[in-house]
């Protein structure tokens, strides 16, 4: 974990309520891994008092990017900041996606991003592809305008499946039925049925709780592993305030853990999903 009080905004993109900021912070960029997050002081004054958590959307040698929606006073202030201004950030924080060190031969990953949940999925997709993993991205939103990163994903050649709640683009409906259809199609190919050595795909997801609960049910039904990046309000991001607890089950026992410290990424078998 590092603190950079002068992370310079070097690029800004906006699409309605969505915003992307690229920050020059070489030390943090070099340490960042998919699924980790930053705690950002959004303004220069004492208000808002608390930092805001943001998934790391991408990184290169010198920069990290965050992608977010203007959902309240804090994110509205952050979205008003411009290139040339500096932000006070802390990171990278949390435990990211567990990718392992095994060879990528035969591996397939299904990545599911709902709305702003696409933020960490993009970083993960680039990392998996660099390792030779066959990557499929399932990107869902309320309407076509809520899929602002789609052109970038298409341009970079990812295998993408799109859904919108209103049917304005792609599959008409939620992302889960589309995910299940493609998962069943993959697992039922003759080669998959014959082979005992080809690995089953793994699912990685981030988005609304209802979506992720649905993805978890699909993963259990098809006996595939899954990891989920949970979103939560956070007061500190370092485990001091207990403001981001989630019930997690390990070794047959459920208990409350801090998302910022133990997560934000958890295995599907660990999460105790609340009733919708």
Predicted features, each with a name:
Residues 11, 58, 162-164, 228, ...:
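Structural signal for conserved beta-strand scaffold positions within catalytic alpha/beta enzyme cores
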Residues 258-276:
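Short microdomains enriched in Cys/His and/or Lys/Arg
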Residues 2-85:
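Ferredoxin-reductase
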Residues 73-191, 197-233:
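FNR/FR-type flavoprotein reductase catalytic core
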């Amino acid at each position: 974990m590092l603190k950079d009080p002068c992370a310079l905004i070097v690029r800004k993109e906006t699409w309605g309520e969505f915003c992307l900021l690229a920050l020059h912070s070489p030390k943090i960029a070099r340490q960042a891994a998919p699924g980790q997050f930053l705690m950002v002081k959004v303004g220069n004054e004492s208000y808002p008092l608390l930092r805001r958590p943001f998934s790391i959307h991408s990184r290169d040698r010198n920069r990290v990017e965050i992608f977010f929606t203007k959902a309240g006073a804090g994110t509205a202030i952050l979205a008003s900041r411009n290139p040339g201004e500096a932000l006070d950030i802390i990171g990278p924080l949390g435990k990211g996606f567990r990718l392992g060190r095994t060879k990528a031969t035969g591996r397939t990953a299904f990545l599911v991003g709902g709305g702003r949940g696409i933020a960490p999925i993009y970083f993960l997709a680039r990392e998996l592809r660099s390792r030779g993993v066959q990557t499929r991205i399932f990107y869902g939103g309320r309407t076509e305008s809520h899929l602002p990163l789609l052109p970038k994903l298409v341009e970079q050649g990812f295998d993408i499946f799109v859904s919108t709640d209103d049917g304005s683009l792609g599959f008409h409906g939620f992302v889960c039925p589309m995910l299940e259809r493609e998962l069943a199609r993959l697992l039922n190919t003759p080669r998959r049925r014959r082979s005992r050595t080809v690995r089953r795909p793994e699912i990685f997801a981030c988005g609304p709780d209802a979506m992720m609960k649905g993805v978890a049910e699909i993963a259990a039904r098809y006996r595939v592993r899954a990891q989920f990046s949970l979103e939560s309000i956070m007061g500190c991001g370092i485990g001091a305030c207990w403001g981001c607890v989630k019930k997690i089950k390990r070794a047959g026992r459920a208990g409350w853990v801090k998302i910022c410290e133990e997560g934000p990424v958890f295995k599907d078998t660990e999460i105790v999903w609340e009733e919708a």
